[in-house]
């Protein structure tokens, strides 16, 4: 039986295993034929959406890996706007409104509110936090 999943990632792209484990879990569930509708990045998890992240050559580039996963499997990547702005992650619209010189939100990610998280959680069979 195929299930619909929603993930919430609260770990940063680098510094602990939560984001990496979430990505590996997402790949595994998709390989097993399940559906992943939404990944919501919250708290320090918003760092997974920072396109200016530059890992060492021998490290996995989690920001680009999430982007590729989303493109290949039509997964929505939502980033908590309030948490992102507190941590210096912004899109062009917010940068303009806040009079910042540029944006750094990786293409494929979308700033959204907790309402998006609630909608995703209510619409899936399994909700898992990393």
UniProtKB/Swiss-Prot annotation:
Location of the active site: 80
Keywords: Cytoplasm, Transferase, tRNA processing
Subcellular location: Cytoplasm
Principal place of residence: cytoplasm
GO molecular function: sulfur carrier activity; sulfurtransferase activity
A Pfam family it matches: DsrE
Record carries keyword tRNA processing: yes
Record-linked InterPro entries: DsrEFH-like, Sulphur_relay_DsrE/F-like, Sulphur_relay_TusD/DsrE
EC numbers for this chain: 2.8.1.-
GO CC annotations, alphabetized: sulfurtransferase complex
Annotated GO biological process: tRNA wobble position uridine thiolation
Enzyme class: transferase
Cited Gene3D superfamilies: DsrEFH-like (3.40.1260.10)
Complexes and interactors: Heterohexamer, formed by a dimer of trimers. The hexameric TusBCD complex contains 2 copies each of TusB, TusC and TusD. The TusBCD complex interacts with TusE.
Family: Belongs to the DsrE/TusD family.
Function in brief: Part of a sulfur-relay system required for 2-thiolation of 5-methylaminomethyl-2-thiouridine (mnm(5)s(2)U) at tRNA wobble positions. Accepts sulfur from TusA and transfers it in turn to TusE.
Record's protein name: Sulfurtransferase TusD
Provenance organism: Sodalis glossinidius (strain morsitans)
Gene designation per UniProt: tusD
């Amino acid at each position: 039986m195929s299930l619909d999943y929603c993930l919430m990632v609260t770990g940063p792209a680098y510094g602990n295993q939560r984001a990496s484990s979430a990505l590996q879990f997402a790949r595994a569930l998709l390989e097993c034929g399940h559906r992943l509708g939404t990944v919501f990045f919250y708290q320090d998890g918003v760092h997974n959406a920072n396109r200016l992240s530059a890992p060492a050559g021998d490290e996995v580039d989690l920001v680009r890996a999430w982007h590729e996963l989303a493109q290949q499997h039509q997964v929505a990547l939502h980033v908590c706007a309030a948490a992102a702005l507190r941590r210096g992650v912004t899109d062009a619209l917010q940068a303009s409104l806040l009079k910042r010189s540029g944006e750094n939100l990786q293409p494929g990610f979308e700033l959204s509110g907790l309402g998006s998280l609630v909608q995703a959680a209510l619409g899936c069979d399994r909700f898992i936090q990393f």
